[in-house]
Amino acid sequence: MAQPHFLLVTFPAQGHVNPSLRFARRLIKTTGARVTFATCLSVIHRSMIPNHNNVENLSFLTFSDGFDDGVISNTDDVQNRLVHFERNGDKALSDFIEANQNGDSPVSCLIYTILPNWVPKVARRFHLPSVHLWIQPAFAFDIYYNYSTGNNSVFEFPNLPSLEIRDLPSFLSPSNTNKAAQAVYQELMDFLKEESNPKILVNTFDSLEPEFLTAIPNIEMVAVGPLLPAEIFTGSESGKDLSRDHQSSSYTLWLDSKTESSVIYVSFGTMVELSKKQIEELARALIEGGRPFLWVITDKLNREAKIEGEEETEIEKIAGFRHELEEVGMIVSWCSQIEVLRHRAIGCFLTHCGWSSSLESLVLGVPVVAFPMWSDQPANAKLLEEIWKTGVRVRENSEGLVERGEIMRCLEAVMEAKSVELRENAEKWKRLATEAGREGGSSDKNVEAFVKSLF
């Protein structure tokens, strides 16, 4: 069989780029395939693809989405970006496929993440197979798929646990105002229903979601995760994907000075902004709780999910509390999350439950306080608290605010009352995740079988 050539297309956001690149590397390493990674110029300009230039069989195809600096200011910008993303992406992919048709390595298959749902149309024009790379858990896919069938009046879906409204991905919630995002997911599900033998690649592992990977009878889900840096499965600290030494010395030295499992790590990722009221409640909870913490707070304005009417950065929002906060813990604008989570001093991860962060908590065996914000995060929080039992989830008040007392309750539960149970469960998932993700593990085998099934 000739060397397969995959054209992998992803949206230019860090949460899409990272797992997609890691899948590309797994695909190359396990099968010897060639991968062309296609995305927008902003990914290159914002240095979102470090340390991949020397990967054999991996090349890049970039095109403009009209926002090459990556700065998105308002809702209109988002819509304009998506229009240019599709128009320019369609042309770039088509030109690339045509240029390689008669060469040594013609494109064999297109792989795409959520948002470039136009990729299958390109594949069909050239009579090529296309496969979706789902970068959220299988559980979230099951919810979206069942919802798309019109079975959404009561949240009781076949082969899934009972769901409350608070467990749904935010784009399916009755209070959702982002109809464009909901339409994107509906479009993907509708396309998959048209396929004769639909197959999707999922950033999960077999032992983590066995029932959810088989919950939809007519769709084959292939577990290819956890899509995290390879070094995380070996315990190596040499990989450049794990740390930036020149930036990490201050917080690593601070962590080194703390006792084992005593520090709360707080991070809400790069996409979502906390309201001023919410950040004040969180700050007060950390101050009054008195436990050492490491809190990542960005000083950037260009969040994907910005709070309307609030112009301050998050770091500006805590200005009035900063002195009190720094008497108890440490505030940084960036850290290597994996480096932090694997540190012996970390006892708890207060997380927004983004899927990459959720996987990292599992692979590194760290219990969590689940503080979901949007997208798939509420579903992920349900998994962490109720299914895998590695964390405690916060509850909002009637106004949608998580009060300081509730935050303190959850932190104390994870650090004290339920710490033994949660840590035992976390260690179990750490072992299973490492077995799946290491070289030659179940996910490597699944990737090999996937490629063989295509050709």
From Swiss-Prot:
Active site, renumbered: H16
Its pathway is: Plant hormone metabolism; auxin conjugation
Read off the Gene3D superfamilies from this record.
Glycogen Phosphorylase B (3.40.50.2000)
Q: Which UniProt keywords apply?
A: Glycosyltransferase, Transferase
Record SUPFAM superfamilies = UDP-Glycosyltransferase/glycogen phosphorylase
Q: Which domain of life is it from?
A: Eukaryota
Question: So what does this thing catalyse?
Answer: (indol-3-yl)acetate + UDP-alpha-D-glucose = 1-O-(indol-3-ylacetyl)-beta-D-glucose + UDP
This entry's Enzyme Commission designation comes to: 2.4.1.-, 2.4.1.121
Any one annotated GO CC term? Golgi apparatus
Membrane-traversing stretches: none
Positions contributing to UDP-alpha-D-glucose binding? Q337, H352, W355, S357, E360, D376, Q377
Record keywords: Transferase included?
yes
What Gene Ontology molecular-function terms does this entry list? indole-3-acetate beta-glucosyltransferase activity; UDP-glucosyltransferase activity
Which residues are an anthocyanidin-binding?
Answer: H16
Q: What class of enzyme is it?
A: transferase
Keyword Transferase (UniProt): yes
Q: Which family does it belong to?
A: Belongs to the UDP-glycosyltransferase family.
What is known about what this protein does? Possesses low catalytic activity in vitro. Also active as glucosyltransferase in vitro on benzoates and benzoate derivatives.
UniProt protein name: UDP-glycosyltransferase 75B2
> Which organism is the protein's source?
Arabidopsis thaliana (Mouse-ear cress)
